């Protein structure tokens, strides 16, 4: 909760503490009225109001002030977090490099479905509250953030490596291929690329950042777009291949998925180079995925 630049002068003309008329009128509101005005509606609070609420003789009003204080502190903390998240981007923006891209992947560990990647170029100065490593967010938070990211992006793109490519190349190489595809699908291409702890075979300079999806706004944004896209895809696959629970676990090796795999056997989108799928097929474990990561 922010305090607006509008202020109430809390001194009368000769310097004696006084309540301005508008502030006095506000403080005549009931606890419910004050809650509706400042807590439920999240309107900005003119400077001078919050201190008055803290000193109000009504316990309910003082409780509202506590809520507003916590909301203000949380907003300030989020602003500081977003500032830290744009450190890598600002290093390039400040040197005149406007097209700073970020790329990330999801779906490396599942037993079923493709690897999905997303690449994003955010507008200079973009600040999207709530962006974080997609794994740290709820499904509802990701679904709310993905449209905001796309709206504030200069461009964004999806890449994919199929189940067949995963089985043929190995999961690590397939992930690199999907990352490259997402980047090369961007238009315009980035002038500089931020990558989560690896290097990609693309024709532009890049900065690998360990845990980049939690340290870079652009990589975090890409991780959210990729996760939402893959989740929707796996829900579609659940309708096509019922019985495995793909819309719930998204292909990851949960007990429910492993039980369904043993009961039903693999379907077309199961990764046959992964050990649990091979065991369900009765194949020798020695022929399992050559190198997962």
Where are these regions (language model features)?
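RNase H-like, Mg2+-dependent phosphodiesterase core
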Residues: 1-101, 105-293
């Amino acid at each position: 909760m922010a305090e607006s630049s509008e202020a109430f002068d809390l001194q009368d003309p000769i310097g004696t503490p006084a309540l301005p008329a508008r502030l006095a009128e506000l403080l005549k509101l009931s606890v419910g009225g004050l809650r509706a005005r400042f807590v439920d509606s999240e309107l900005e609070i003119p400077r001078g109001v919050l201190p008055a609420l803290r000193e109000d003789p009504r316990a309910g009003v003082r409780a509202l002030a506590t809520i507003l204080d916590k909301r203000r502190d949380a907003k300030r903390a989020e602003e500081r977090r977003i500032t830290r998240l744009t450190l890598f981007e600002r290093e390039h923006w400040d040197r005149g490099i406007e097209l700073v891209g970020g790329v990330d992947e999801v779906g490396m560990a599942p037993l079923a479905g493709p690897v999905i990647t997303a690449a994003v170029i955010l507008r200079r100065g973009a600040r999207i509250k709530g962006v974080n490593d997609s794994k740290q967010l709820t499904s509802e938070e990701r679904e709310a953030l993905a449209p905001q990211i796309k709206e504030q992006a200069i461009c964004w793109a999806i890449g994919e490596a199929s189940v067949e490519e995963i089985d043929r190349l190995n999961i690590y190489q397939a992930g690199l291929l999907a990352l490259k595809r997402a980047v090369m699908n961007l238009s315009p291409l980035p002038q500089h690329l931020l990558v989560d702890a690896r290097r990609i075979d693309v024709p532009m300079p890049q900065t690998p950042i360990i845990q980049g999806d939690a340290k870079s706004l652009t990589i975090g944004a890409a991780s959210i777009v990729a996760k939402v896209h893959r989740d929707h895809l796996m829900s579609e696959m659940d309708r096509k291949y019922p019985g495995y629970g793909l819309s719930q676990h998204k292909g990851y090796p949960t007990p429910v998925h492993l039980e369904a795999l043993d009961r039903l056997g693999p379907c077309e989108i199961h990764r046959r180079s992964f050990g649990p799928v091979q065991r369900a097929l009765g194949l020798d474990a020695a022929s399992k995925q050559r190198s997962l990561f």
